[in-house]
């Protein structure tokens, strides 16, 4: 065999070995997984004991699922009667367990929110914030319902911290809360005549002492979350400030949470990346909607 033939054979063998190695041990870049947990509740009133009004949180989930799927996210959807406190906690715990280094994680909640009287005295204003699962009751009742199904911000923060640690510095966590921890009865002058008012949240705090909820007026719209060399970057987006109401908007005959709608619109043409650039686009769109002049999106982020 000529030296040229031997070289060709050797190159062919090397090529086969490289391909086999790539299949057995994929490069790290290809190991990144995009994961999304989407929770949305519309039909609260079908569980009459909870006393919550119907909204359109499940619409947000369906809207976003299609867009995130096009960006190759592995999607878990939990809506309406499925979205109990037990199920939401189970899915969050499962997400923590399944995450790997370098993953991109998106968590979305569309539903009601409520302020809850602070029990461990770690809140300056005396109130925690809670997302409201399908089976969380609106009113405190001693010995009957004392808030077990409210999912507090402290509990959510623990899940978020665990995810940030699992995905590490090369990963990313984005959290969207299209709810509200206040609520109102009217929106303003930019509504269409045939447009109903759907507000997410309530002004009634969940309190064993019937303590009235009086949120401080903080006009800061951007808060800094501490960064860590061993944890991923994080962005948390909220539909409005603590003293404002979050009103649904009507688009193409359907009602959506405004934050969800404009995130979806932005992600139609932008990738969900570890960056604030696409977040700023969402903010500009919300600021430009005349129906939303009385609410301001809030950004919490460890990114610079």
Where on the chain are the PLM-derived regions?
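Cysteine endopeptidase catalytic domains of the caspase/legumain-like
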Residues: 20-21, 25-304
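Bacterial N-terminal signal peptides that target proteins for export
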Residues: 2-15
């Amino acid at each position: 065999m000529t030296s040229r033939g031997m070289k060709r054979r050797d190159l062919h063998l090397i090529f086969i070995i490289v391909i086999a190695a790539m299949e057995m041990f994929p490069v790290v870049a290809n190991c990144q997984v995009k994961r999304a947990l989407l929770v949305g509740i519309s039909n609260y009133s079908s569980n009459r004991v909870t006393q919550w009004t119907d909204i359109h949180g499940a619409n947000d989930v369906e809207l976003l699922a299609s867009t995130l799927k096009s960006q190759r996210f592995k999607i878990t959807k939990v809506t309406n009667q499925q979205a109990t406190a037990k199920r939401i906690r189970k899915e969050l715990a499962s997400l923590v367990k399944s995450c790997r280094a370098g993953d991109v994680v998106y968590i979305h909640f569309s539903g009601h929110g409520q302020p809850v009287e602070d029990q461990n005295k770690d809140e300056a204003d005396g109130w925690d914030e809670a997302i409201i699962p399908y089976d969380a009751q609106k009113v405190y009742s001693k010995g009957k319902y004392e808030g077990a199904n409210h999912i507090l911000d402290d509990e959510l923060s623990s899940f978020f911290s665990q995810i940030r640690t699992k995905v590490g510095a090369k990963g990313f966590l984005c959290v969207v809360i299209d709810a509200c921890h206040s609520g109102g009865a009217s929106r303003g002058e930019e509504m269409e005549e045939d447009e109903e008012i759907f507000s997410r949240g309530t002004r009634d705090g969940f309190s064993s002492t019937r303590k009235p909820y009086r949120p401080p007026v903080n006009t800061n719209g951007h808060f800094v979350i501490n960064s860590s060399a061993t944890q991923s970057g994080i962005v948390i987006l909220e539909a409005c400030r603590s003293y404002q109401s979050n009103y649904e908007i009507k688009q193409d005959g359907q009602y959506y949470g405004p934050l969800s709608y404009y995130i979806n619109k932005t992600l139609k043409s932008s990738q969900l990346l570890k960056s604030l650039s696409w977040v700023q686009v969402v903010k500009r769109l919300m600021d430009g909607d005349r129906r939303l002049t009385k609410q301001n999106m809030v950004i919490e982020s460890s990114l610079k």
